[in-house]
Amino acid sequence: MSAVGALLAREYNVTAEKCDFFLENGSFDSVIAALPALNQEQETVTQKVSKNGKELINVASVNIEIPERISLSNNGRQLFKFIVDIEILPCENDNEATLVVSSDSVSLFQIGFKMENNSKIAVDKQLPLILDICAHKNQERALRNQLENRKSLERKPSRKRRKKNSNVNDPEKLLKSRIHELSLSYKDFECSPVVFRYNDSSLTWVLSFNLKLKFLNNKFNRFSVEANQILDLTFSNRDENEFERYHKHSHIHSNFIQKQFISQILEYSKDRLSKIKPFLPQSIPDLKVNLLPFQRESVEWMLIKEGHGNSLSDTPTVIDEVGLIDFMNEYYAYGYELIARSPDEVGPSLLWNKLTGYILTTEDAAHLYNQYRKERLSGDYPVCAKGVLAEEMGLGKTIEILSLILLNRRKLKDSEATFIDDENRTITKTKTTLIICPNAILKQWLEEIELHANSLKWYTYRGYNEIMKDCKTVDEAVQQLCQYDIIVTSYNIIATEVHHAEFNRSIRSRRLKSPKYDYSSPLALMQFYRIILDEVQMLRSSSTYSAKCTSLLHRIHTWGVSGTPIQNIYNFRMIMSYLKLHPFCDEVDFIRTLQEEIKLRNEAKDYTSNDFVCQLKGVRFSIKDCMNIFYRYDLCIRHSKANVASQIHIPRQHNFIIPLEFAPIEWDNYLNLWNNFLELSGYNSDGSGSPRVSNAFLNEWLSRLRYICCHALFPEILSTRQKRLHGHLSRISNIDDILISMRMDAFDSLIGYYRERFHLSIKQAQYELEISNTPAKALESFIKIRDDLMIHIRQKFNVEDPFDKSLNLSEDEDEHMDERFGEKETSSGDESDREINGAKNHDNHNNDGMLSNHLKKKGLRAMMNLLHDCYFFLGSVYYNLGTRKLEEADDKHRKEKTEEVVYSDVFPKNELEEIEENRLLEQENYANAEILRKSILSSEARKVDMTIKMARTKFAPMTSNIPLRLINIEFDHKNDYSSNLAVSRCFKSLSKLIEGLNEQTKNFNELLDELLIIIYEPVHRTEDDDSTNKIIGNEEYSTSIDSQDKIFSLLGCLEIILQNRDNILTSESEVKIPKHLVPEGSIISKYQKQLLNSLRLISGTPLRTVFDELKNSRIVRRISSSNESESTIQNFEDYLLQYEVESKSLFKYNKQVRESLKILGSIYNAKTEYYSQLQRISDSLVSLHSLSAPQLSHLIRTINKSLGGTLDAKINNIESRLIYLKNLSRLKDTLNDNQILSCSICLGEVEIGAIIKCGHYFCKSCILTWLRAHSKCPICKGFCSISEVYNFKFKNSTEKREKEIQEPRREGADSSQDNSNENSIISNMSEVEKLFGNKYEQFHQINEVHQIHIKESFGAKIDFVIKLISYLRLKSEQENADPPQVILYSQKTEYLKVIGKVLKLYHIEHLACLSNTANVGETINNFKRQPSVTCLLLNVKTLGAGLNLINAKHIFLLDPILNNSDELQAMGRNNRIGQDEETFVWNFMIRNTVEENILRYKCILEERKRKEKSKKGDKYDEAQDETDNEESDDAKFEISVVDQEVSNEHLWNCFFHGSD
């Protein structure tokens, strides 16, 4: 038997044969090496303190049974000697598994085992980590023993003197390094030595060890991730059944969890409120309205939360460990779990907060509980209610809050009027309730108080500055505010109050005994009885100023009020922070991590688990944990209208759909934008195809298409064009303005297409010249392009001679175009067509002409640029055919002979004549290009000349009073009449400064002279310039760069001098010259660097300091000097001090000089514009040889594609559209006169029509059939092709326009069905129409409303709004009813502004609240109090919630609201408790557009939801709470959940669903 076997036999009490068996098979010899003290017993579990002073507690006792025979490889000797990877493979039985040990990816052995008495240890999660910790700790212990053995050997005496080993491979150093590495891992744990013992009864080996946690008691512990993970897995009590009790749905794949939260709260509220025994009377004193039963339930719940009926008997004297956990979680911080000690451990168990790391003993927790109970008994610790009243909108949350205030008023003792807070501020206890609400409903709160509880004394707090106007001190303001029962303020005011709330005068350092000012907010010096946040979701995040200020305010009770308190995951932190639920109101942010993890999972489309759990520092945290907090601590209740329908009696709300058709002008405008979208997105008209754009791009286009359904001009387009019309921004764009805009857009596009076609043609010819080297072919191409350009300029712009020097190409000058730019009318061979095409003189004709002139100048300028390029390249072609041949002959002859070449000896006579002719043509074409270049640049050159002339006039030496140069300061530097050293020092400083300023003046004026020479130089060349230069403009442009750089540098240096001069004149501290005189990173030219180095800048003591010292000296002198010398001394000091007045004059003078430099800067800007245009011309002439191979290939592909017919088709189509648009005004009149537009082929009515370039109209199908067989117009016989056809929709009949909404549409019914989108769930369009009709009612009087006459048209939707308002007003007058009041909701602020202008035009009194400003509440209050105000314009997102507007019986939803909650909020403004009449919602929709697609698709989603509910056996009721019983996956039923953006899976349907 080996020695090791004997050791094992003795220590483990087993037979030697068994030990030798294991040793022979390589089982445990290396294990024994790692465990040097096998004969020691395990560490006593009573050990309490670690070596570093931290306390210890046993967190895991591991006993693993291993079979007697182990299949072990030779590598198994590495166990515990090196860090190993351990994997646990679970077996069928919970306490059995397979242990897999590997090292360096090599499997060492597998052991089947089972756990003994370790039910808390999760085999699959905890055990691998625990074993890994054990391996680390035992290896560290072995290495420390090894190191100690080496040291003990070195300490033995030796006769030989050993040298100190400095080798980096020294074993001792390596050991220390390895020990250090191991000590950094799992530093929060200690592990006992591993003990092997043999169990004779089970014939197994048992591996045992204890794992202990090192911790600091009554302190925050920063545990490692591994420590938190083991503690969380071992001790966290996660009761899944508790959650499922109130929440029936699996979890979602989205951050948007509003429906899930409210579904849970509704379930909880039913259970919680049913347990409350009613105790409120039927009528509440001082409340002028009786509460409904469900309202009494809510008030009773809040009263109980605030301590009603609670007595000390409710708090037991002694509580167990479970009770302590609940107490600590509710009253201190959420997250405490119990770490129980094992029976053989000494000491109390621990409470560990998994979110903060704080640990305390159960004894300490019991002490805190006893202290709390004692304070409750003495009244020092009142019950502090925290909660959210989340009643559905319209159920009377305001009345419930007022009832709470009336029923539970604070009783204060005079002896306890104040207390000192943690920041040493004196806080006054008050009876007051602080209500914070949005601006929009602040007045509404005051009205409700006056109407229902006018015994309550209230005050509107408007901020620190306002209240301090009436109070002398902050303490006085506090005493004044304490007198009120209610203080009402807004979120905006609270946000501005945050800095005053943070101010603390008790910690301000000061030299005086009492502070001069106190900027403390009076709100921060009061302890309110309760704070109520109405629409609490308005806090948005805990980092906003409103949230910060609210958190600083002292209160007893904390309430939030909102119908939708939780919308997304991050709202949990906002609500919990406001309710002061620790640790969520502190820095630890588990919720943000959870939100980000879910976002990442969604982006990866990882939906493998319904309940997503994230880990923060090893601690598990999920949405379930967030939701559980609310019912675990009774934080929120809610009633829905569906639940209390039997108690409330709200009259019916009618939901009308108003389908409208575009007028022909609007329809063409929409189709043009739609076609642009299709072209850019890659979709086909039926929704097929592969999009090439992002979802953000699609959302942007959807927004544009939705806006154009409301008004045909985008705000930015309208603004730009009205500015061109001399700034008439207040003018409303009517339908004629829209037509003008459409024509201008079409004409602008046509110019672009023509420009592109000619440009590509020039590049094609240039390719033939430079790359193909075929000058003869290139010559032919360029001549054709030149001729085509000349014809185009003559026909399109009526310009006969492009070389006319009087031609005006300026786009920005105010003078009108010459008559040469007048439009030519399209001729036609038919009299009726000429009558249609004959334009009327409309009121906006001048505006049309001005915009047209602007665009035509722009187009002519583009064509002139192309003509210039063409002439230049023609010169290049003739150069290749003429001059270049002579140059090649010269070069060849120069190499062979010295004498000059005789060209007649080289070329035949006829060829030489041809060369000479080509040389003359070369010069002629280059000259023509130069003339055109000057003509193109003439407007920019004129601007430069005008600005130079203006500057010369302003700065004329004899007539100008405008300062440009600096002036010297006169000063006597020699005679110093100072009476003392102080004055003398001032004299010398002043003398030095003035001397420096005068030198600086000289420096400035010299630079200015240099600037004037350069800046006054003209930009264009004279007629004597060599116009035959082939590189036109290159030399000029090169010179201009140098000139512009000099001007820029000089202007910059002059400004630096003025700035330095201002500092010397006005600074109160020492002036320092900046290290960098120009911004860092700026490119500095050599010339600019020289200028900067030559600047004369002044540093040191400024003038103001000198004058201050001089004044101080005079004060001292007056006290000490005699009267005899007073007069002389004073005169000298006064002489010096007069320069103080002079310095102020110099500062003003510097300001005037700076303004003068701005005039010179305008010359620089004008020159820059000129040279930029010159550079663009030069860039257009770049040789193709300078392009890279990919660039050249791309150019060739573009030429082949575009010139192959694509551009011609676009040009033909848009020319036909221009003719159509020109005739639309006449067609509009035809429609108004009830005339019919007939097709000349089939003689039928034109509905879906087409127009060709000659201006004739036909049915679309007729003309397409005709042109397939003919190439001429059926009427005028003019040539035309299919590419010239422009299609349009034209409906005349009112009956067709207002088809019954329930009728099925058959056109294109299947267009969207082939799409693979899974949301296209209804294939039968008649079923879609049925769903559409089920949700909305039909307004049967819609035709009568259409017949109402209005004096001007602004578009289909705006026109009908005006007509419907007029109809409602006339109807109310006939019925002797009150005048109607209407709320107009839209998501487009700019559209509401347009509506407001139209309402004003028709004398319809209205008010607008487009954003949540300070006066919005007053505006809404005026609407409620003044029946004469017909309309209130509101923005859906900013003012859709919280308003009580039951005075308005009508709500206009001007455009589809994407988010269901926002839509219901808007519809609920008048459909609430207190409404005694039927109300009406009018949904405006433009047929055959994205608006109709959106509304239809929302109906389909509702049907899908209804079907899924029916499958689950749940009853679906449309009247139910909008968020009750919803499917948990919101993305399936919500088109939009954030900021009116459509989610990815619904985008396609919004564009194409049900499209024709």
Curated annotation (Swiss-Prot):
Main location group: nucleus
Gene deletion effect: Displays increased levels of spontaneous RAD52 foci in proliferating diploid cells.
Positions of ATP binding: 391-398
GO cellular component: mitochondrion; nucleus
EC number, UniProt record: 3.6.1.-
Phosphoserine PTM sites in chain numbering: 810
Ranges annotated as biased composition (Acidic residues): 1519-1529
Region named Disordered: 145-170, 810-850, 1297-1319, 1508-1534
GO biological process, alphabetically ordered: DNA repair; double-strand break repair via nonhomologous end joining; double-strand break repair via synthesis-dependent strand annealing
InterPro entries: ATP-helicase/E3_Ub-Ligase, Helicase_ATP-bd, Helicase_C-like, P-loop_NTPase, SNF2-like_sf, SNF2/RAD54-like_C, SNF2_N, Znf_RING
Residues modified as N-acetylserine: 2
Transmembrane segments: none
Annotated Gene3D superfamilies: P-loop containing nucleotide triphosphate hydrolases, Tandem AAA-ATPase domain, Zinc/RING finger domain, C3HC4 (zinc finger)
SUPFAM superfamilies: P-loop containing nucleoside triphosphate hydrolases, RING/U-box
Helicase C-terminal domain sequence ranges: 1363-1531
Residue ranges, compositional bias (Basic and acidic residues): 145-156, 817-827, 834-846, 1297-1309, 1508-1518
The protein's role, per its UniProt record: Is probably involved in a pathway contributing to genomic integrity.
Protein name: Uncharacterized ATP-dependent helicase IRC20
Organism: Saccharomyces cerevisiae (strain ATCC 204508 / S288c)
Gene from which this protein is expressed: IRC20
